[in-house]
Amino acid sequence: TVTCGQVASALSPCIDYLQKDGAVPAGSCCXKXLSSA
């Protein structure tokens, strides 16, 4: 099972960008990764 934390760690560049841009919360980025896995 892949946890949200593991996905967040793998997508840290994506999450960092989204958080800086302020358009999408990190949770949303994580959720997209889990749904596409």
Swiss-Prot record:
Its main location: secreted. Gene3D superfamilies: Plant lipid-transfer and hydrophobic proteins (1.10.110.10). One of its GO terms (molecular function) is lipid binding. SUPFAM superfamilies: Bifunctional inhibitor/lipid-transfer protein/seed storage 2S albumin (SSF47699). GO terms for cellular component: extracellular region. It is found in: Secreted. Keywords: Lipid-binding, Secreted, Transport. InterPro entries: Bifun_inhib/LTP/seed_sf. Belongs to the plant LTP family. Plant non-specific lipid-transfer proteins transfer phospholipids as well as galactolipids across membranes. May play a role in wax or cutin deposition in the cell walls of expanding epidermal cells and certain secretory tissues. This is Non-specific lipid-transfer protein P4. It comes from Vitis sp.
